From Swiss-Prot:
Organism superkingdom: Viruses
Residues bound to ATP: G269, V270, P271, G272, S273, G274, K275, S276
Keywords: ATP-binding, Helicase, Host cell junction, Host cytoplasm, Host cytoskeleton, Host nucleus, Hydrolase, Nucleotide-binding, Repeat, RNA-binding, Transport, Viral movement protein
The (+)RNA virus helicase C-terminal domain, residue ranges: 380-520
Species this chain originates from: Barley stripe mosaic virus (BSMV)
Additional facts recorded: The genome of this virus consists of three linear, positive, single-stranded RNAs encapsidated in separate virions designated RNA-alpha, RNA-beta and RNA-gamma. Three proteins (alpha-A, beta-A and gamma-A) are translated directly from these genomic RNAs and the remaining proteins encoded on RNA-beta (beta-B, beta-C and beta-D) and RNA-gamma (gamma-B) are expressed via three subgenomic messenger RNAs.
Protein name, as recorded: Movement protein TGB1
Any one GO CC term of the record: host cell cytoplasm
Occurrences of domain (+)RNA virus helicase ATP-binding (ranges): 236-379
Protein task: Participates in the transport of viral genome to neighboring plant cells directly through plasmodesmata, without any budding. Multifunctional movement protein with RNA-binding, ATPase and helicase activities. Engages in homologous interactions leading to the formation of a ribonucleoprotein complex containing plus-sense viral RNAs (vRNPs). ATPase activity is probably required for vRNPs movement complex assembly. Intracellular delivery of TGBp1-containing vRNPs to plasmodesmata is facilitated by TGBp2 and TGBp3.
Length: 528
């Protein structure tokens, strides 16, 4: 049998493995049939030899390994029981429990583990499958990935994407916290500024602390329900224009919800002590404060200063205004519910009340004195009123010390003639009408609270005794002038007024009602 023919037959049958074997090896000389004894056994032995060579694993130079497709691939025939030969004498079969991947084969696996995602771990492949594809091998691959990244499976589960709603809540919480910090710093600085301003104006610090009110303070003291009921009762008997204004207030009471906690306190001073000067200084400072005037007639006194509004205009404004700092001038003219409602609408963190506690009247829940707020700074020294007026006011139960010059106080009969003054005032509507009938302009004392005039004439009649029982009104009427005060009074009431010996039998307190009955609510102020 010719060996060359046999090789050619193998080539034509496409057996590349035989080609690979004989290209780099020497073909041994096979004895002929005659040399082996003349029988045909040599041919059959040669075929068996070639068959075995065809199925024997191929050895490759330089220790290169052949690549197999998958872990399930097996070499048929003899190779099924023949161990794979690996360079450096490595074993081909390892136990699944303690099998280790050789150094040169671990590098590709580690590189691939860097690209793996914890959420979807990739199945081990490559060298792990080459060494049997056992379960132990896949576990080794997973452990390598976990140890390399330093993240356990439990930590990987917790490291999920945060929902948008949770992120939004977290962002809002951070904003609220930052806003609270900013607000606290602003209030502390403003308190220090108020303290310095009051001391420069010779106001005395009483040692009391600001009252800290909760955001729902309006509801806690039952004032919101009282005010709601009061507004509904007033709407039933009000005119069209007034009804619309009351309706808007009622809507605010029901719509505005608790916003922020706030601090509040009172700066109290006698007439002429410098309260208006303090308010102007605070408004001109570096702090963004808003001032609400309980008496809109004082608007001209604050001309050229930003942030000054009438209390009703600010409360019912169509344009929403917010401010951390709220100052209320002549607070005794404002209703307690209006102040708390204004604080809620402006979201103010501090409400500073400026006025004279002696000019207040705690008879019903509508009075701010009903809240019993602390007086933080006080002054009994007047720089505008002279000694004569200060002595007269002290007899009325309003103690004050004058550091001004001497002024003039003239007391005469109601009927007669006197020098004309800049302003004429009276306690009741009937007296105002009587003065106007004589050709003189006249105003109610309550309407000029907070205003100042160079000279004033005060008209008193016997019919005004009930109005004179109001200590608050007496102080207002006696302290509107700077240099001259003329008192024209009937003989029956003159002496009692000068000595303060007036029937002051006050009515019982009606703090359980927001508004008193008409006959208890100084109806003599208004025209009938």
């Amino acid at each position: 049998m010719d060996m060359t023919k046999t090789v050619e037959e193998k080539k034509t049958n496409g057996t590349d493995s035989v080609k690979g074997v004989f290209e780099n090896s020497t073909i041994p000389k096979v004895p002929t049939g005659q040399e082996m004894g003349g029988d045909g056994s040599s041919t059959s032995k040669l075929k068996e030899t070639l068959k075995v060579a065809d199925q024997t694993p191929l050895s490759v130079d330089n220790g290169a390994k052949s690549k197999l497709d998958s872990s399930d691939r097996q070499v048929p025939g003899v190779a099924d029981q023949t161990p794979l030969s690996v360079d450096n004498g490595a074993k081909s079969k390892l136990d699944s429990s303690d099998r280790q991947v050789p150094g040169p084969e671990l590098k590709p696996n580690v590189k691939k583990s860097k690209k793996k995602r914890i959420q979807k771990p990739a199945q081990p492949s490559g060298p792990n499958d080459l060494k049997g594809g056992t379960k132990g091998s896949s576990q080794v691959g997973e452990n390598v990935s976990e140890n390399y990244t330093g993240i356990s499976k439990e930590a990987a589960k917790q490291k999920q994407k945060t929902p948008k709603s949770v992120k939004m809540q977290s962002n809002l919480a951070d904003k609220f916290k930052a806003n609270d910090t900013r607000r606290s710093e602003l209030i502390n600085k403003f308190q220090q500024f108020v303290h310095e301003t009051c001391l420069k104006s010779d106001f005395e610090y009483t040692g009391r602390q600001y009252f800290r009110a909760r955001s729902n303070f309006f509801e806690m003291i039952k004032l919101a329900s009282l005010y709601d009921k009061h507004l509904k009762e007033c709407m039933a008997r009000a005119c069209t224009l007034e009804r619309e204004r009351l309706k808007r207030k009622l809507l605010l009471v029901r719509a505005l919800k608790p916003a922020v906690d706030f601090l509040t306190g009172i700066i109290s001073g006698v007439p002429g002590s410098g309260k208006s000067t303090i308010v102007r200084t605070l408004l001109k400072g570096e702090f963004p404060a808003v001032c609400a005037l309980a008496n809109p007639a004082l608007m001209n006194d604050y001309s050229g200063i930003e942030g000054v509004y009438g209390l009703d205009d600010l409360l019912l404004s169509a344009v929403p205004i917010t401010s951390d700092l709220l100052i209320i001038d002549e607070y005794t003219l404002a209703e307690s519910a209006e102040i708390l409602l204004l604080q809620r609408r402006l979201r103010a963190s501090m409400v500073l009340l400026v006025g004279d506690v002696a000019q207040g009247k705690a008879t019903t829940a509508s009075s701010i004195e009903y809240l019993t707020l602390p007086v933080i700074y006080r002054s009994e020294t007047t720089y505008r009123l002279g000694q004569e007026t200060a002595s007269l006011c002290s007899k009325q139960g309003n103690r004050m010390v004058s550091k001004g010059g001497r002024d003039t106080v003239i007391i005469t009969d109601y009927d007669g003639e006197t020098d004309e003054t800049e302003k004429n005032i009276a306690f009741t509507v009937d007296t105002v009408r009587d003065v106007k009938d004589c050709g003189y302009d006249c105003a109610l004392a309550i309407d000029v609270q907070g205003k100042e005039f160079d000279s004033v004439t005060l008209f008193l009649r016997n019919e005004d005794r009930k109005a004179l029982a109001d200590k608050h009104l007496r102080l207002v009427a006696l302290s509107r002038h700077k240099s001259k005060l003329i008192i024209r009074a009937d003989a029956e009431i003159r002496q009692a007024f000068l000595t303060g010996d007036i029937d002051l039998s006050s009515k019982a307190s009606n703090s359980h009602r927001y508004s008193a009955k008409p006959d208890e609510d100084h109806s003599w102020f208004k025209a009938k």
